[in-house]
Amino acid sequence: MKILVVLKQVPDSTTTIKIMPDGGGIERAGVKMVVNPFDEFAIEQGVRLKEKRADVESVTALIVGPAQAAEALRTALAVGADQGIHLKDETFDTLDELQQAALIALVVKDGGYDLILTGKQEIDLDSGQLGPALAELLDIPHVGATVGLEVAEDGTSFVARRRVEGAEEVVEITLPALVTGEKGLCEMRYPSLPNLMKAKKKPVHALTAGDVAGLAEATSGVGGMKLHGFEPPPERPPGKILDGEPEEAVKELVRLLREEAKAL
C-alpha cells in the first residue's frame, strides 16, 4: 500500500498578518508559516498506518508552494513520512485550489497511490475544495471530515467515521480512495530532535512547471475562483468607559445597548 499526504503551508494563526500594498496577497517576509492544522491530522494518520501495517510500502508528503514551503515538508518527514514532493514554480502561485488539484492529479496519477490523505480545509482561505476536487480528477471515491479510519486486513478497503450535523456516519470505501481529516482523527506527534535531523537526509523531489507535462491543458478552463484582493477587517471603534455613580452608569449602558448597539 502506498500512501500520499497532501499538505499546505499557512500563516500561523497567532502571527500578525500584513497585506501587500496592492492587496494581491499577504507579506510572507517575517511571517511565521506552519503546516495547515487540518493537514497535521492527515500526516499523523498516514504515519500511524505505516507503523501499524506491514503492507504499507511508503508514505509520501506533497506540497505546492514557494521555497519556504519546504519547511512544512521537512516537518512531515520528521514525523515519519518517507519522502517528499515539492511543486514549486512562480506559475503555481497563481493557481486557485481547483487548478492546484489538476496540477497534483497530473503529478500523482501514475504513482500507484492507494490512499490519499489531506485536511478537510485550510485555515487561510477556508474553502475545503482541494481534496474533493483531487478525488474527482483522479476518479476515486472521497470521504470528507473523517474522524476515524480503519483499513481492512486485506488492504482493499477501509471503514471511516465522519461527522454529519451532530451525528457520526460510518461508511465503507474500496481503495484507492481519498480521505480528508477532521479534528478528532488523530493529533500529530511532536517530532523528536533525532527525527528532525534524519528528515534532512530524506529525499525531496522538487518539480517545476517544466517538469509537469500537459499542465497548461489540465489547468485551462479549470477553476472559477478569481481573487480580487485582500483587505484588512475594519478597525473596531474605541470602547467607552462609563463614569459616575453605578446607578447612572447602568442607565447609560442600557441606553447605549438599545440605541447605538441595537442589542436590546
Where are these regions (language model features)?
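N-terminal glycine-rich FAD/FM-binding segment characteristic of electron-transfer flavoproteins
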Residues: 1-264
